[in-house]
Structure formats: structure tokens, C-alpha cells
């Protein structure tokens, strides 16, 4: 095997596309030591491509530091970090080629993480005599791949060092802070209390805004407006908010019933500027505006990249490099839903795309590189559509509008009116953005205007809005919290760990208490400046301005100082967080204890619904895979209030707040178990999937997966083939019966049930993994 080439790819899908393009489709697949690799000829040389699945090794502390209760946290900060094998199969495959290779080409993603993965592979496979090169590409297309292998570059070890430093720093900070808060509050095991150097200041942003809202005191003010009529109605407003009621009424009485005279009028043509090309942050912000959460949007974008449909989705760049052949890209987009605009852009004498403020050389902005051969479904189609229409908008023409302003004199007071009229929608026609026109007719100075309505309105100042996903991502970028590749994950972790919820984003009582505890000891880890300084240092590693070891050591000194503050006030931290954990969200009055409230307490995996009075029988847990509100219905059995549990894709579940009420048992009971005559009860798995399980579990392990979408009701019938209860499914205006035993002959003999079976197999296969 002497004299051959090895190519290291980051993922299997990317590896297959690279091998296909380099070989012209002539690829052999091999499997050895539990992993697959590809063989082909390239440039007259035998070539093997080894696809990895992310990191081969991972950073951890050396052995002896695993006991959370016994290890001194100061010692943990300075513990030696080792690299343990994470992917044994990939490690053994690379080892098998060690010393037998003439050339190694790293073809992982060209960013910090990708470079570190490539360097990890090099450390395993190289002996020192091999030629080591790097393929840099930004899209998994034929032209990009072939061009990158014709123009191989050197490995960027500084890029890998920056990623390695981040991995070490995040390990140290995350482990020390998480252990401190978890041990201090007694939240161990699955309920551990997570903390980190980036997620803590990000949580603080959300908490600070909530505190602003809570402490906000509205102030009254008055506004005055006049409606005029000239070829249509328009409004002019008094230019100030008037804080004094007497002054407002004085002005109103002076202008009421009076006409106006134009004292000035200006009109000008203006542009509706095209958006800048997509950076990662702006893409995620726009995706959140169409209802796709950042973590999901990034996952979909990575999938589209692997399929060769879009460029690399992790980038700060907002300027298309000259190397992109825009006309060639447009040619591939001619058969999309926007073909009309594609063909129009192709007729431009020169295509001059918009430009953003940030220009980098690692990757271009996100743009479509090909059109899908088959229609993309669901959110995949929506994300691709967003990227496509955004790209076309950056190439199209600016919109145009006429902007007008007028000052109108009314009995000693000046009122102002403004209007705009879109004369050319331009790019907004593609993007689906509809500029709002405000009517203001053409006026001349000295012209008399007829007033038809005079209005005085009392208003109140409003609190600042909560952050939504879009504005939170923007704020993180402004404060240099995280990177383009990590911000969506940080938000996702805060949601998963019960610190924040909803969109707009609201902190949970636990999130509020956590930040209060952090700030009670003056530790500064909630301040963005500390983590932003470390982000800047990691940028300096990439630029060869600092060494990896210097940055890691500096971060350790910071953490020692932070820890010393916490250790002096352990009891205070415990008290604040414990109160936050027990606070919960109030959803209504308790019917059994006057003056007490029913609370919903959110844990990492469950909701606890309980009364403030610890002796009350209202105390039960529900798996945390939906939202809980107090229903306006009363229980038909006992008359007590009911709660509504809303899970995505399922009809709301209504429960009586009395856990012993027969209403709950009757509505969860779907019939007799055919195996042991127990009751088949509706359950929710830890993954949020609904299924039927026998009430005699664990003695009886019978379970039936259920369709995850639609409303399921009892029919009272029993299956003549297997004895299970026959159920009815209502969905999309249709209703049909089915047996929950999806292999049953009943379903095979009834045509509509084929659709049910397919739905269950696809969406309910994990339902019984409780």
C-alpha cells in the first residue's frame, strides 16, 4: 500500500461527495474495524478517503478528579488536561494507515473546529515523512471541490490552537462552576445545575431585561393629532408627548375646530436598501422571524450544506468574494420558484451585489449553490427558500420610495405630518417584505387645509420588550458573547436546562435566582466583559499574536479569583438558588387552601404542579414536553379547576388538578390490556411521545405506540383479531378507526389504517422508550 494518498473528511456525507467529484463517480467502499472508508484513483494515485464523525479525541481531566463531592475545586482548575479517545473506531482505522502514507490531505470544514479535528487525525496517522496539505472549500459542489484540490494550502495550526484553547477553557470553567453550584444546592445526578463562562452572561442579559420590565413604572402622557382632508385623509401630530394634562387640554382647546395652513413641505426620492449578504448570525435571526428556532435552523443549514445545496453556514462574512461566479450560480437556480427574478438578474449588464460591513477570507456569506432535485419539505424547504430569496435580493435592484414631510400651522401651534410612497418595490418583491406606505398628498407652502377631526389621547409609556431569538442573537454578537458557531447552542442549552423559556424569551424563576446568586458574591461571571476578553484572546491565538498556553493560563487565574468569591458565600448562594427553584410559576388559586396558589415548578425533565401549602394533596409531576396553563373549564366530576397541557402536534390534554379525581383515570384509560386484563393507560415517554402502556407495568410490559399527530378517542370496541381496544384518530378533518397494535390484521384489512401505520412507524418508534 506504499505511495498512496489519504484524505480526511469531517463527516460521511461530505466524504462521499468529495470522493465522487474527485473520482468522477468511480468509488469503491470498504469496511474495516467497524468503519467505512472509500477508495478511488485521483491524479493517477491511489487515494483513500476516511470520513470521521466529528472529534476523534476529547479533552478531560486526568483520572482521579471524577468525585464531585470530594475534589477541591481549586485543584480542579489546575488539574492536567488529557485527550481521551472518543471515537475508537476512527482511531483504529487511522492507526492502521500510520506509516504507509505518502500524502495526507485534510478536507474537514475550514473553521476552528474543523481544523482541530483535522490536526487530531494528523497526530494519529502521521510519522513525519508524509506531505501534509489542506483542501479549503466553502461548498460541497463539483467545481469547489476540484478547485480546492488543485490549489491545496498548508494546515493552519493557529486555527486549531484557538479551538483547542476554547475546548480546554470551556472544560475547566464549565466543570468548576457546574460542580460548585450543583454540590452547593444539592442538585446532583440528572438534575445538576449547569453553568458556563458564556451561558451565564447570556442568561444575565435575559434576566436584566426581565428586571427592567418588572421594575418599570409607566408614566402618563398626552398626544394630540388632527386629521386633514385633501384628496384623501392624513394625520398630523403635535411633535411632543405632553406630560402635563392641563397643558395638553389647553393646546387641544386652542386647535379644536380650527383648520390648518402649510408652513413647510419637503419631498425627496429615497432608496429601500437591499439587505447585506447572510452571515450566520443574520441568517439565524431571520430564521427565528419565520418561526424556526436557532438550533433547528443551524441543524437544517448544515444538512443543506452536506447535500450540496448551500454554502458553508458558519461565517461572519457579509461580502461576496470575487471568486464566486454569480452567473454560474444563477444558472443553477433557474428552475426554482423564483425563476422569473433569476432570469431578470441574468439580463443585467453588471451584477453588483450588496455589501455588508464585515469582510473575511475564510468563507463567503451563506448563499444557495444549487437547486434541489426534489421539493424540500417542511422547515427544510422554508430554510432553503429563505436563503434563496435573500441571495436573490442581494443581487436585485434597490427599491425606491418618495418620502415627504410637512409642518402645518394651526392657531399658534405647529403640527407635523410624514408620509411615504413606494414607487419601485425592487428587491422587496422577492423577499416578501411589504414596505408600508403612509399617505401624505403633495402640498404647497401657504396652502390652507381643511381639518375634519381633532383628537387628544392619554397614553402610557411602555416597558422595554423582552428579547426574542433574533434580538438576543444580535445582543450576544454586540457583546462578543460566543461565536457565530456557538451562539445558537448556548441559547439552546439555557432552554434545555430550564433557565429560560418561550419566544420572546423569559427567564424562569431558576434563571432569575441563578443570576441573583452569581451577583450576590460580586464574582463578575455574569458580566459580558470577562468572557468577551477570553473571546478576543482566542482570536489573537488564531492571528499568532498569543499562544494557546498563555490564554489558558490567563483564564485559570480569572477562574481562581471567581471561585474565591463563591467559596466565601456558599450559604448565601444556596439560599438564593433554592428559593428560586421552589418559587415556580403561579397559575391560579388553590381550591383546598384559601389564599394559597397553585404553582408550576419547572425542573430539568418535569413540571411539578403543586400547592404552596406543603400539606395539600395537589402535588404531581408531568413530563416537561409542553406548556401548562389553568383551563377555564371546571371538572365535570368534582367541580375543581382543570389544567391544560399543550404539546406540539397533539390535541390539548385536560386534567383535573385533584390527582385522585376519577376524571383523570377515566380519560387516561383506553381499555383492557389483552395480555393480563390490566388497563391500557395513556403515557408520555421521556422523548415526549405518547403511547399506551399496561397499568400493571413492570409485571406486564405491553406497550402500543400511537400516532403523534391528531386527536385520539375511545370507541368502546375491541379488536376481533388481537383483543386490543379499537381507537379513533381525528386529523385534518378526517376520522378513522385503528387498532393500536400496528401489526394487527385489523389494520391490514382496512385501507385508511395504512396511513396510520406509516405515521406511527415514522413518528412513534421511540414511544415506548419510557
From Swiss-Prot:
Protein's GO biological process? DNA recombination; DNA repair; DNA topological change
Q: Which cofactors?
A: Mg(2+)
| Reaction catalysed by this enzyme | ATP-independent breakage of single-stranded DNA, followed by passage and rejoining
Where is the site described as Interaction with DNA found in this chain? 55, 166, 170, 314, 497
Where in the chain are the C4-type zinc fingers? 611-638, 673-700, 719-744
Pfam families the UniProt entry points to = Topoisom_bac, Toprim, Zn_ribbon_Top1
List residues traversing the bilayer. Answer: none
Residues annotated to bind Mg(2+): 10, 109
Keywords (alphabetical) are: DNA-binding, Isomerase, Magnesium, Metal-binding, Repeat, Topoisomerase, Zinc, Zinc-finger
Tell me the segments the record calls region Interaction with DNA. 194-199
Record-annotated Toprim domain positions: 4-140
Record's function text: Releases the supercoiling and torsional tension of DNA, which is introduced during the DNA replication and transcription, by transiently cleaving and rejoining one strand of the DNA duplex. Introduces a single-strand break via transesterification at a target site in duplex DNA. The scissile phosphodiester is attacked by the catalytic tyrosine of the enzyme, resulting in the formation of a DNA-(5'-phosphotyrosyl)-enzyme intermediate and the expulsion of a 3'-OH DNA strand. The free DNA strand then undergoes passage around the unbroken strand, thus removing DNA supercoils.
Q: In which family does this protein belong, per the annotation? A: Belongs to the type IA topoisomerase family.
How it assembles, according to the record, is: Monomer.
Query: Which protein, by its recorded name, is this?
Result: DNA topoisomerase 1
Gene expressing this chain: topA
